[in-house]
């Protein structure tokens, strides 16, 4: 039994701390749990890793994080050793349990390999990490986060020097380097104190935060909105990283807002929600309650790493309405098309193949092109780089995917809920000032361009059994579905 060999190896490895070995010893006799923790190595995919926290090869822990980091370090050094050591890497983390520990372990491994590691003093959003890569001019970046996944999860995403998540050719090459590491003893690691003493672990100061927020603020379209001070907004970061920066942005622009006090402080236990996911209506419960109490017309919610945003708005019957990710994307696009000055003639909107086809009629109505990528915002970030390098003809205007991810501006190369929240607040206040609303503007879109309906169903399959079920489902799909699905031809 291969999983039992791995279990025994971890029990006896000098690289594993005694307290973690105690956890492993407590599993003795529980073969099912041992198998689930060790039956495979947690997969380092093309963007990073994500999984349930715990000790084992199929869990997120500091040893798995170290292995991933050693693989990335090996790739950086093989790609260009001089450049890797000169430019280094930037590291951020969210509010989740273990995130700070994993971020420091990442820095310690990089430092042990002679690569400078710039690290934020405490939690920061994913889009600020994306911004930080180009701001500091590093070769790569890492953010420790599991985004909007359940509380027991954590993870780790890798970015390249353009500030976007890694894509080809880097992604598969990094995966290959990680997979070459067979033992924990191959991983280089030094103490945090030694890394700081050698100048290889460097703490970032607050200037990067200020400059990131300044970059966001350049994306505002209307600062002088009549009656803005009377338009009430409720905001919640759902216990995540968005609270501090979003309060600052809304305050600086003079919005009348209140935060959900029970959810404003970072807390990796997410005590007030089942899932800290703005795609879930239940996540808005406290926000909507506060909005009803103070007479607010919109609630904005970010996920824990502040790269996604969901909203609740009042409809024509004064009931709460929850626009989905596609609807918010289309509303933002229409607002930009109608209010942004000097849109280039080669402007492009970028979205994914699973997002709404309604974009194909809205964007061309203003002579703006549409480009579609595979699922994942990393491909949208890749297109920005290709525009800048003149590999493709186009100027980036806006990017979005149906899963509540949007990017306005090119300060970051990943979805950014902070800049999006700022523009949504502006959009909502502006529509209110002209006697309209977000809901009413959505209905206008449908009347002008036609009605579209999309939906998502999420299915959770856990553990080894879940992985096997998923594999069987996909195998059946590939084997039995060839040219047609549900009466539709597959292109």
Segments (PLM) and residue ranges:
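Phosphate-binding and adjacent anionic-ligand microenvironments
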Residues: 292, 297-298, 321, 339, ...
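Gly/Ser/Thr-enriched, mixed-charge loops and adjacent short helices
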Residues: 15, 33-38, 42, 154-283, ...
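Conserved phosphate/anionic-ligand binding catalytic regions in large, soluble enzymes, centered on
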Residues: 38-58, 146-147, 237-245, 304, ...
């Amino acid at each position: 039994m291969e999983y039992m060999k791995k279990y025994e190896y971890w029990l006896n490895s000098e690289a594993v701390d005694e307290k973690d070995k105690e956890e492993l010893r407590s599993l003795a006799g529980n073969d099912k749990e041992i198998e689930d923790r060790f039956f495979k190595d947690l997969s380092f995919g093309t963007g990073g890793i994500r999984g349930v926290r715990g000790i084992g090869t199929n869990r997120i822990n500091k040893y798995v994080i170290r292995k991933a980091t050693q693989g990335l370090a090996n790739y950086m050094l093989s790609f260009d050793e001089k450049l890797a050591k000169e430019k280094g890497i930037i590291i951020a983390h969210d509010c989740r349990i273990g995130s700070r520990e994993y971020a420091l372990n990442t820095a310690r491994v990089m430092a042990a390999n002679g690569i400078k590691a710039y690290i934020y003093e405490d939690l920061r959003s994913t889009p600020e990490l994306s911004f930080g890569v180009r701001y500091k001019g590093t070769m790569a970046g890492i953010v420790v986060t599991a985004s909007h996944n359940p509380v027991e999860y954590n993870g780790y995403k890798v970015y390249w020097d353009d500030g976007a998540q890694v894509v080809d050719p880097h992604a598969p090459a990094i995966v290959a380097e990680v997979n070459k590491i067979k033992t924990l003893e191959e991983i280089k690691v030094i103490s945090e104190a030694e890394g700081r003493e050698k100048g290889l672990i460097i703490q970032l100061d607050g200037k990067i935060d200020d400059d990131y927020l300044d970059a966001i603020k350049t994306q505002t379209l209307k600062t002088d909105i009549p009656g803005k001070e009377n338009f009430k907004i409720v905001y919640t970061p759902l216990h995540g990283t968005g609270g501090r920066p979003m309060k600052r942005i809304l305050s600086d622009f003079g919005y009348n807002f209140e935060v959900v006090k029970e959810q404003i402080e970072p807390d990796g236990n997410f005590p007030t929600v089942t899932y800290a996911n703005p795609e879930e209506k239940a996540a808005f419960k406290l926000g909507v309650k506060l909005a009803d109490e103070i007479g607010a017309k919109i609630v904005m919610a970010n996920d824990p790493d502040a790269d996604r945003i969901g909203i609740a708005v009042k409809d024509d019957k004064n009931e709460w309405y929850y626009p989905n990710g596609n609807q918010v994307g289309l509303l933002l696009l229409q607002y930009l098309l109608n209010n942004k000055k000097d849109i280039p003639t080669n402007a492009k909107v970028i979205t994914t193949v699973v997002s709404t086809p309604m974009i194909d009629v809205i964007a061309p109505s203003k002579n703006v092109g549409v480009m579609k990528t595979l699922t994942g915002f990393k491909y949208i970030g890749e297109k920005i780089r290709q525009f800048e390098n003149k590999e493709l003809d186009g100027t980036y205007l806006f990017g979005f995917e149906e899963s509540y991810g949007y990017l306005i501006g090119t300060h970051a190369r990943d979805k950014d809920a902070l800049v999006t929240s700022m523009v949504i607040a502006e959009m909502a206040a502006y529509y209110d000032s002209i006697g309209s609303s977000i809901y009413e503007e959505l209905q206008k879109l449908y009347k002008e361009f036609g009605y579209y309906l999309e939906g998502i169903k999420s299915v959770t399959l856990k553990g080894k059994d879940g992985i096997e079920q998923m594999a069987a489902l996909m195998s059946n799909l590939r084997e039995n579905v060839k040219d047609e699905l549900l009466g539709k031809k597959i292109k």
